[in-house]
Amino acid sequence: LDTTEGVISAVKYTIKKHGLDELEEKDLRKFIGPPIQDSFARQYRLEGEILQDLATTFRNQYKNVDLLKAKPYDAIYNVMDILVKNDVKIAVATYKRQDYATEILTHFGFNKYTKILYGADHYNKLKKKDIIKMCIDDSGIVNYKDVVMVGDSDNDAIGAENIGVSFIGVTYGFGFKNEEDVK
């Protein structure tokens, strides 16, 4: 799902509410994908409790106002149908909070493709490799060589590498913009 509109809207709200300097569009887009505290820490060079305050403001706004402003990528339903038809087990490993991810995937009908979904915890203690591992464990797959992580960011690629599964990078998401980025 392309969650750009909702994420950027919630980031702008958080910035305004906390009196932070406004950002250009290119910098706002950097908030899409990584854990929200990491994005605020990197962008504003912040640390400590303020990051949790910013994350709480963002999450409340995103959940209550901006969550469903997402759009499915072109042909994604067709791809999912083909995977299911070929008995491919599908799971979702995301840095979105699990409750948000469940709501958004259900809203857009992706829950018919998988019941295996794990996301970030409220305090962002889980790394991507932890989230991927939970998906694999829940799927019943025991041989990690049978697993492929499809993702659009360095976080996805590193998480897959750290747990020992293959990775396919895609450029239609937020992180990788071209084939060179994937390498």
Model-inferred region functions:
Residues 128-157:
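Conserved Lys-Pro-Asp/Glu-containing loop-to-beta segment of HAD-superfamily phosphomonoesterases
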Residues 77-85, 136, 157-161:
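Surface-exposed amphipathic alpha-helices with a cationic face
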Residues 111-126, 146:
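A short, structured active-site edge motif that brings together acidic residues
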Residues 4, 11, 76-105, 120:
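Substrate-recognition element of Asp-dependent hydrolases with the DxDx(T/V) motif
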Residues 14-15, 35-49, 104, 135-137:
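Helix-loop "lid/cap" segments that line or gate small-molecule binding pockets
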Residues 1-30, 85:
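Active-site neighborhood of HAD-like aspartate-dependent phosphohydrolases
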Residues 41-78:
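Metal-dependent phosphoesterase signature
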Residues 148-183:
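Acidic, Mg2+-coordinating phosphoryl-transfer loop and its flanking beta/alpha structural elements
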